[in-house]
C-alpha cells in the first residue's frame, strides 16, 4: 500500500454484480499461494459480501484508513451501473473517494458464469449519466474524478463516455484482445489456448502479447477520439466532458422500433456551458489523527531505532491509531530487521475504529479499556493487546472488549484480548495469531491461514468458507457442533501432544499479555480443561499440516 499510486476498492464487478467468485485449487500455484497467503492447491473463495463495508460510513472508514497509510495514493471506488446508483455515488463522494468508477454489464470477466455475462447488469451509459447528474446537482462533482468501463472498445465509445461526464476510461477486454486473447471464456479452467490466463507452463509459452501491441491500440483509439473532438469543433477532451447537449437519440428506422426513450440520459444537470469538469487534480485530504502527535513524540525512535514506550489517553473519536505510524516505520526501516515491541504505545480509554489497522512488525499497541470495530484490520506483523481497565470489576470472559470485523484480512502479527470480540471475527485471516474469550457470528469466515483461539462461546456459522489455518474453541456448552459446517471442516477434541502444546503455549502468551483470570484458570487446571477444547481444521489442508491432528496412524472419525 505504501508504494501504490492508486488503490481501488472493488465493491462489485459489472460482469457479475452481487456475485463473488473463486480461484480453483488447480490454479493456486506456489507463487499464487505465497502472494495470497494461502495453501498450494487449495481453492480460494472470493465472497460476494464485503464484511467490513455494510454502509457508506463503513466505506468512509476504509477510505480514511487507506489514506492514513498512503496519503499520496488516489482511492478509487468501483460501483456497478444500476438503478439508483446516483445516491450511492453521492455517498462515496462524501466519503472522500478520489475516483468513482462506474462499471457496465459488458465487462469481459472470462471466469463469470454465462448467465451473469448475458443477463446481469445494465449499460454503463445509464449508470454514468445518473451519477454525473446527481453529483452535479448536489455540488459534489468537482470533488471526484468519474471513470467508466464495461465494453469500451473504440474511440467513439470513449467520446460518448466523455460527453456523458466521464474523465477517465478503462479498456480491459480490448487490451487483452490486443495481447492475443481470443475470448473463449475458459479463464476459470486453466486451459486458455493462447496462454493469456493460465498457470500451465506449456500453455503460457503460447503467449505472444507485447506492450507495443497495446501501445498501438491506444494510439489508434486516441487518434479516433481526436478526430471526433475536431469534428465537434473542440480542441481538447476536457472541453466536451459532460456536454450531453451534443448527443441525440437516433432512430432505428421505424416508429414501432423507437419505443425506448433515452432523454433521461441526455439531461444536463448544469446548463452553464462554461462549467469545467476536469478540475479535480488533487487528492482529498482525510484529516489528522493522533498518529501525527505520536510520530513527533517518537522522533528518537526514528533517528536511532532505540526501544521506545509512549503513553496516551484515548477516546472513541481517535480513529486508526497506529496506521500512519506503521507507514512511517515501514518507510524508515523497510526490509531491515526490527524487533518485536520496539515501539510500544500504552493507551487508556476507549479506542476508536480501526485500532492497529495495518500495524507492522515492531509496533505494539496495549489498550487498557476497550476498542471499537476493525481492530487489527489487515494486521501486518504488529501486536495488539486489550484488557479491561484495572479498576473495572467486570468479568472479562462475560463481556465484550472489541467490536465487529476485527482481524479482517490480517496477514501476520498477534492480537490478545481479555474479553469477547463482536461478529465477523478473523474473517480472511491469513497468517496472524489471535486469542479472545468469545466471538459472535461468522467467526473465521474465509480464513486461509494463522491461528485463532476462542476461550469461550462462538456465534453461528463459524468457519464458513475456511480453507486454511487452525482454530481452537473452548466448548463450554457442548453445542459447538451446531454452529459449524461438517461438510468442509474437521472438528474434534485435542488428540495430539503437538497440538496440545501449541494451544497451551498460545493461552500462556494470552495470560502473560493480558493477565486474564479466565486464561489463568484454564492453565492452572489444564489436565481437566484441555478436554473442553475443540480443534477445527479445513478438510482441504489435512495433508498439508506440519503435524497430523491425531498422533496414531489409525484413522479416527471426526466427532
Language-model region placement:
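Alpha-helix capping/termination and helix-coil
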Residues: 70, 132-135, 139, 225, ...
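Long, distal/terminal scaffolding or interaction modules
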Residues: 203-204, 215, 228-232, 241-244, ...
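Alpha/beta enzyme core
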Residues: 1-149, 154-183, 190-198, 237, ...
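A glycine-rich phosphate-binding loop feature that marks nucleotide/adenosyl-phosphate handling sites
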Residues: 79-87, 145-156, 178, 234-250, ...
Amino acid at each position: 500500500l505504501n508504494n501504490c499510486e492508486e488503490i481501488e476498492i472493488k465493491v462489485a464487478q459489472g460482469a457479475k454484480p452481487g456475485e463473488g467468485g473463486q480461484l480453483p485449487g488447480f490454479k493456486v500455484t506456489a507463487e499464487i499461494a505465497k502472494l495470497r497467503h494461502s495453501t498450494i492447491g487449495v481453492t480460494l473463495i472470493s465472497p460476494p459480501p464485503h464484511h467490513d463495508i455494510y454502509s457508506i460510513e463503513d466505506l468512509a472508514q476504509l477510505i480514511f484508513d487507506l489514506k492514513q497509510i498512503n496519503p499520496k495514493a488516489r482511492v478509487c471506488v468501483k460501483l456497478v451501473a444500476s438503478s439508483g446508483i446516483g445516491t450511492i455515488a453521492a455517498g462515496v463522494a462524501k466519503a472522500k473517494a478520489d475516483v468513482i468508477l462506474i462499471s457496465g454489464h459488458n465487462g469481459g470477466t472470462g471466469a463469470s458464469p454465462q448467465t451473469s455475462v448475458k443477463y446481469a447488469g445494465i449499460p454503463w451509459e445509464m449508470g454514468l449519466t445518473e451519477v454525473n447528474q446527481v453529483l452535479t446537482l448536489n455540488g459534489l462533482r468537482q470533488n471526484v474524478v468519474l471513470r467508466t468501463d464495461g465494453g469500451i472498445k473504440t474511440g467513439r465509445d470513449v467520446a460518448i463516455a466523455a460527453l456523458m461526464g466521464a474523465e477517465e476510461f478503462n479498456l480491459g477486454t480490448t487490451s487483452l484482445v490486443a495481447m492475443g486473447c481470443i475470448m473463449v471464456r475458459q479463464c476459470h479452467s486453466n486451459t486458455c489456448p493462447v496462454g493469456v490466463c493460465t498457470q500451465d507452463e506449456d500453455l503460457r509459452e503460447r503467449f505472444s502479447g507485447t506492450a507495443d501491441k497495446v501501445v498501438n491500440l491506444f494510439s489508434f483509439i486516441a487518434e479516433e477520439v481526436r478526430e471526433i473532438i475536431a469534428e465537434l469543433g473542440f480542441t481538447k477532451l476536457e472541453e466536451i466532458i459532460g456536454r450531453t447537449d451534443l448527443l441525440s437519440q437516433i432512430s432505428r428506422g421505424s416508429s414501432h422500433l423507437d419505443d425506448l426513450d433515452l432523454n433521461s440520459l441526455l439531461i444536463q444537470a448544469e446548463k452553464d456551458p462554461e462549467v469545467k469538469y476536469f478540475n479535480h487534480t488533487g487528492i482529498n485530504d482525510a484529516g489528522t489523527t493522533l498518529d501525527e502527535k505520536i510520530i513527533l513524540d517518537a522522533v528518537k525512535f526514528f533517528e536511532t531505532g532505540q526501544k521506545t514506550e509512549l503513553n496516551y489517553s484515548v477516546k472513541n473519536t481517535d480513529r486508526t491509531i497506529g496506521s500512519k505510524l506503521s507507514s512511517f516505520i515501514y518507510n524508515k526501516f523497510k526490509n531491515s530487521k526490527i524487533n518485536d515491541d520496539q515501539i510500544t504505545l500504552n493507551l487508556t480509554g476507549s479506542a476508536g475504529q480501526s485500532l492497529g489497522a495495518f500495524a507492522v512488525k515492531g509496533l505494539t499497541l496495549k489498550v487498557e479499556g476497550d476498542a471499537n470495530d476493525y481492530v487489527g484490520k489487515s494486521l501486518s506483523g504488529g501486536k495488539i493487546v486489550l484488557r479491561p481497565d484495572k479498576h473495572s470489576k467486570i468479568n472479562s470472559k462475560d463481556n465484550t472488549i472489541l467490536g465487529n470485523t476485527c482481524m479482517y484480512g490480517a496477514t501476520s502479527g498477534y492480537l490478545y484480548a481479555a474479553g469477547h470480540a463482536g461478529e465477523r471475527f478473523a474473517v480472511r485471516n491469513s497468517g496472524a495469531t489471535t486469542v479472545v474469550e468469545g466471538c459472535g457470528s461468522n467467526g473465521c469466515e474465509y480464513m486461509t491461514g494463522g491461528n485463532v483461539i476462542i476461550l469461550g462461546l462462538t456465534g453461528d456459522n463459524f468457519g464458513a468458507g475456511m480453507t486454511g489455518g487452525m482454530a481452537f474453541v473452548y466448548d463450554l456448552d457442548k453445542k459447538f457442533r451446531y454452529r459449524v459446517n461438517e461438510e468442509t471442516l474437521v472438528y474434534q477434541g485435542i488428540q495430539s501432544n503437538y497440538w496440545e502444546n501449541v494451544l497451551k503455549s498460545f493461552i500462556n502468551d494470552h495470560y502473560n499479555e493480558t493477565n486474564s483470570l479466565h486464561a489463568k484458570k484454564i492453565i492452572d487446571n489444564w489436565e481437566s480443561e484441555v478436554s473442553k477444547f475443540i480443534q477445527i481444521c479445513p478438510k482441504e489442508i489435512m495433508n498439508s499440516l506440519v503435524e497430523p491432528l491425531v498422533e496414531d496412524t489409525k484413522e479416527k472419525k471426526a466427532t
